[in-house]
Regions:
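Bacterial Sec-dependent N-terminal signal peptides
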Residues: 1-22
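Low-complexity, acidic/polar, glycine-enriched regions of mature
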Residues: 18-187
Length: 187
């Protein structure tokens, strides 16, 4: 009986140590993007409602498993008319494809706190592999709630055309979409 108890205790301890769960601090996070309009100006936007889960046992996050889900209907470019157009079948078709997801496949450390984040991005019913730059801004303990926190910046560029996202010519709205995400995680 002692052996079984010790075995169960070791198993539970192993599970706890193996994959530490990190959750998104939504008040300190933004999932943003920008595109070029008419080849002369940038238009910025974000998804106001998104969630991110990170599981990692290593302090440098090289073993992290990252899952992101964003509500397409929460797209916000500070212009209601444009936001409505982006939600329409001309672009995201939010009625048919209400969410976009990202699931990591690997994280490779490039140098000090810089990583290559590889995963599958699904939006508008299309899944494609993407490689993003990820920067670990730091880890610390929040003095107010005593939780461990970590901050990341994620940057990358995708093509609208890869996801069948709008037939508007690139001279009007760039095919390249720059992703800029800043996230703070709690453990």
């Amino acid at each position: 009986m002692k052996k079984i108890t010790l075995l169960v205790a070791a198993f539970v301890a192993g599970l706890t140590a193996f994959g530490q769960g990190w959750t998104l601090d939504k008040s300190h996070a933004k999932l943003g993007f920008n595109v070029t309009h008419m080849m002369v100006s940038d238009v910025e936007g974000s998804f106001k409602n998104f969630d991110l889960k990170v599981t990692s046992a290593k302090e440098d996050f090289t073993d992290a498993v990252i899952e992101l889900t964003a509500d397409v209907n929460s797209i916000n470019t500070d212009n209601e008319k444009r936001d409505g157009h982006l939600k329409s079948s001309d672009f995201f078709d939010a009625a048919k494809y209400p969410s976009l997801t990202f699931k990591s496949k690997s994280i490779q450390k490039v140098e000090d706190k810089k990583y290559k984040l590889t995963g599958d991005l699904t939006m508008h019913g299309v899944t494609k592999p993407v490689v993003l730059d990820m920067i670990l801004k730091g880890t610390t303990t929040n003095p107010m709630n005593k939780k461990n926190i970590a901050g990341f910046k994620v940057l990358g560029t995708i093509k609208r055309s890869d996801f069948s996202l709008g037939s508007i010519p690139a001279a009007v709205v760039s095919d390249e979409v720059n992703i800029v995400a800043n996230v703070e995680l709690n453990k």
